[in-house]
């Protein structure tokens, strides 16, 4: 039966399994990877709902900036294995730092060097 579930449903089942014991914190590793935008948005809404309804702290590791901005109260931006920036999504978006701006604008060749 699990093989007949859609990717989005498998993610939802994984979330249900993760919260069944009412943890105080859940670590999500690329929770929207491989999902179409509509399903990814529903997973992000579910994560936000769990944060609000159950007071669960969520640590989300993602390369998907839309998802990061959708679910985050705080963002830590890592560069070369270190926290390069930490703040709110708005503070990240408004940052004038060239490395961050290049990343947000998709000019990844700067941060890959």
Residue ranges and their predicted role:
Residues 86-87:
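ABC ATPase "signature
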Residues 22:
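Conserved catalytic motifs of ABC-family nucleotide-binding domains
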Residues 1-5:
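Conserved ABC ATPase signature
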Residues 41-53:
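Helical segment within the ABC ATPase nucleotide-binding domain
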Residues 26-29:
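Catalytic Walker B motif of ABC-type/P-loop ATPase nucleotide-binding domains
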Residues 15:
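Hydrophobic anchor residue at the start of the ABC signature
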